[in-house]
Amino acid sequence: MIPLCVAEGVGVLPWSPLARGLLAGNRGTVRAETDDIARRFYTHESDPAVLARVGDIARRRGVSNAQVALAWLMQQPGVVAPLIGATKPHHIDDACAAVDLKLDAEEMKRLTDAYQPHPVTGHHQ
């Protein structure tokens, strides 16, 4: 779908760009431990590798995991604005900081190579 959107000049607005907080690294929160949707949707075998690489880049850059994940997403062709679900002020701070964070080609490749597309899930199947 994304290549078609790019070819037709249609902007992409990714929903839940941090995978319900998974990419922000918040696995130890009450929400993460009780979120049945996240457990159902974000259990692909490639997910741990993606999380590890996001965390590694964030540590090396001195930024949050959320900033790295959002920066990667915003550097993808066709993406015009991720739809974040901010519930705390620092979520907005991370999203704003991600706009100015430019990942280099090696970092982009490390993240892209680890990711495997997930099957379509949810009520639109």
Describe each PLM feature range.
Residues 1-32, 64:
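Aromatic-lined glycan-binding groove of carbohydrate-active enzymes
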Residues 11, 80-82:
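Beta-sheet entry/capping signal
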Residues 26, 40, 63-65, 82:
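Short, flexible segments with low predicted structural confidence
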